[in-house]
């Protein structure tokens, strides 16, 4: 299985990768990282992703714009998406869900919570 992690903070990308690899050992996972929404869009045609994790606040294409694009694209709309963000209001969660995100995780989070939500996401795939 292949996961795309879209996060502009290199330290958060490294943390997400470490947590995912440590908590999903029973899955044969490959993690691909993108530092921006634009980089994610350039990466998509070269891989078949089983799930995408994206931050919201990024410098070029934000995570919600990315979710909207993916869920409206015939090739990518079936890929499950988890939004991971410091944006914690119910309105933010509803907006992400309305755009098609299957999961929403607020930073900071417990590693186990990320792993649990990712396992749910991968079952959807």
Question: Which functions belong to the PLM regions below?
Answer:
Residues 59, 89:
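The feature encodes the CheY-like receiver
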């Amino acid at each position: 299985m292949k996961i795309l992690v879209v996060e502009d903070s290199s330290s958060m990308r490294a943390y997400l990768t470490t947590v995912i690899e440590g908590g999903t050992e029973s899955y044969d996972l490959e993690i691909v990282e993108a530092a921006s929404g634009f980089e994610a869009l350039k990466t998509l045609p070269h891989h078949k992703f089983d799930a995408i994790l994206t931050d919201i606040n990024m410098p070029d294409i934000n995570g919600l714009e990315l979710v909207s694009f993916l869920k409206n694209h015939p090739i990518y709309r079936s890929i499950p998406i988890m939004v991971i963000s410091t944006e914690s209001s119910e309105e933010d969660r509803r907006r992400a869900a309305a755009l098609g995100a299957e999961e929403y995780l607020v930073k900071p989070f417990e590693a186990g919570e990320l792993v649990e939500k990712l396992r749910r996401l991968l079952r959807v795939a």
